[in-house]
From Swiss-Prot:
Job of this protein: Responsible for synthesis of pseudouridine from uracil-55 in the psi GC loop of transfer RNAs.
Signal peptide as annotated in the record: none
Origin organism lineage: Bacteria, Bacillati, Cyanobacteriota, Cyanophyceae, Synechococcales
Keyword flag tRNA processing: yes
GO MF term set: RNA binding; tRNA pseudouridine(55) synthase activity
SUPFAM superfamilies membership: Pseudouridine synthase
Protein name, as recorded: tRNA pseudouridine synthase B
Keyword terms, alphabetized: Isomerase, tRNA processing
Top-level division of the source organism's lineage: Bacteria
Protein species of origin: Prochlorococcus marinus (strain MIT 9515)
Gene this protein is translated from: truB
Length: 305
């Protein structure tokens, strides 16, 4: 089977770990060079982009935002901040209208400080927090800054204390923490009931496929690989027009921009990455222009010599 470089967008089902999905793709495609773009907890479903081949080198250049649909259960606190965890407290939730509840959600919009759940992949003294948790070790996690781009109250079941939210957030945001902390600001408790990621790193649920469906496709599963260049549409582009420039690029040397690229680069932010392609629109890698915007520095070079 021909192995392509690019991304397969998995619609992860409950019970699978992100690593399970990576291992299955490795097995199906017969390649070890496979990696995911960010862990989804086993109980969380939805969009999990998986990079294949040289695409693994471009993960850091993908859009970092993620969007979820989640249900929060008020009145219950658990050790893991989700409904699967051991219950440690129960407390009545307040009677609120949709508008009143939405005002409380304002505390979680924009840039906020958030303490991750103890069952998380955050490092504590060189070890993952979840490993310490399952060894019953005592430890504390420090607040971290995260950004909530959008937080929409979609439904509010006042009788059962369940609200549904849509949330777009930065990498590193824990929705379980929002569930827990919302319970706190309501003078109640809270935990995450269900969570589905509908988009991540510029990829969307509508383009995803379940692992079980990929397995059924067997040798045809490579047709679902999205070429890396399409995943970088959000990045500005420069075209290397001649072989001399390409030779300089492939050997990692500084390239003096020609007149056409000088005009283009004048509009670029020199601190941001640039997608480099050739005349055939083939991806060559990622570069940065200098502060004077007249030279190109190779940063990530495909087919380096």
């Amino acid at each position: 089977m021909e192995i392509k470089d690019g991304f397969i967008i998995i619609n992860k089902e409950k019970g699978y770990t992100s690593h399970d999905c990576v291992q299955q793709i490795r097995k199906l495609l017969g390649t070890k060079k496979v990696g995911h773009t960010g862990t989804l907890d086993p109980g969380v479903t939805g969009t999990l982009p998986i990079a294949i081949g040289s695409a693994t080198r471009f993960i850091q250049y993908l859009p970092q935002g993620k969007t979820y649909i989640g249900q929060i259960q008020l009145g219950i606190r658990t050790k893991t901040d989700d409904i699967q965890g051991e219950i440690i407290n129960k407390k009545e939730w307040p009677i609120l209208s949709n508008a009143q509840l939405d005002k409380f959600l304002n505390k979680f919009r924009g840039i906020i400080q958030q303490i991750p759940p103890k069952v998380s992949s955050v490092h504590v003294n060189g070890e993952r927090a979840y490993k310490k948790f399952f060894k019953n070790e005592e430890f504390e996690l420090k607040p971290r800054e995260v950004k909530i781009e959008e937080l929409v109250l979609k439904k509010w079941d006042q009788i059962n204390g369940i609200l549904e939210i849509k949330i777009s957030c930065s990498t590193g945001t824990y929705i379980r923490s929002i569930a827990r902390d919302l319970g706190g600001v309501l003078d109640s408790e809270g935990c995450l009931l269900n969570l589905k990621r509908i988009s991540a790193c510029g990829f969307h649920e509508k383009n995803s496929i379940k692992i079980s469906d990929l397995v059924n496709l067997n040798k045809n599963c490579s047709t679902f690989i999205i070429p890396t260049i399409y995943a970088l549409d959000h990045i500005s582009t420069l075209i290397l027009n001649n072989q001399e420039e390409i030779n300089f690029w492939e050997t990692g040397r500084l390239i003096k921009l020609d007149e056409e690229n000088l005009i283009k680069s004048s509009k670029f932010d020199y601190k941001k990455p640039i997608k480099i392609i050739n005349n055939q629109k083939m991806l060559l890698g990622i570069g940065f222009i200098n502060e004077d915007k007249n030279k190109l520095h190779p940063k990530l070079v495909l087919n380096a010599k």
